[in-house]
């Protein structure tokens, strides 16, 4: 395994264990996956949500890990050589919220879909996306303008 010097210091005082193909450490009684230290979510899939730039799955240097889908409910895909972002939410099956040209707008659309689900009486606690590089004003402006699928809105209406 290869690590940056800062991480090497951390791992020198923690034993790296492996279970069912997942690497983790015990830290204060909690099992923490190695990938979670790099901002990769526990449900992430390699080559869909993150990738190793040089192809070496044992190279955990920050420069070698690219996070493709950093937000909940958002998946990047290629359409005619351009990246697009598909937003889905799971309520008794997957519902497509929409397809967006930029990642930030897609993440906000997911948050809006979660808010609409809660307003429709769905009690499930969905994780929400936090966009660091936006002011509250900019976030609110995008939130009000972002469109959500008509099919999704009709589905929510059918639940009421």
Please name every model-derived segment:
Residues 1-160:
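Boundary-flanking segments of nucleic-acid-binding domains in nuclear regulatory proteins
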């Amino acid at each position: 395994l290869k690590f940056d010097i800062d991480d090497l210091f951390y791992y020198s005082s923690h034993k790296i264990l492996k279970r069912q193909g997942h690497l983790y450490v015990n830290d204060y009684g909690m099992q923490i996956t190695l990938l979670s230290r790099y901002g990769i979510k526990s449900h992430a899939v390699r080559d869909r949500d993150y990738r190793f730039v040089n192809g070496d799955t044992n190279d955990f240097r920050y420069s070698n890990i690219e996070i493709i889908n950093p937000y909940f409910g958002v998946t990047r895909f290629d359409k005619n050589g351009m990246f697009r972002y598909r937003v889905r939410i799971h309520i008794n099956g997957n519902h497509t919220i929409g397809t967006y040209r930029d990642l930030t707008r897609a993440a906000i659309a997911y948050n809006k879909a979660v808010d609409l689900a809660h307003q429709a009486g769905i009690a499930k606690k969905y994780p929400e996306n936090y966009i660091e590089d936006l002011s509250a004003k900019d976030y609110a402006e995008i939130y009000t303008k972002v469109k959500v699928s008509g099919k999704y809105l009709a589905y929510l209406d059918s639940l009421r």
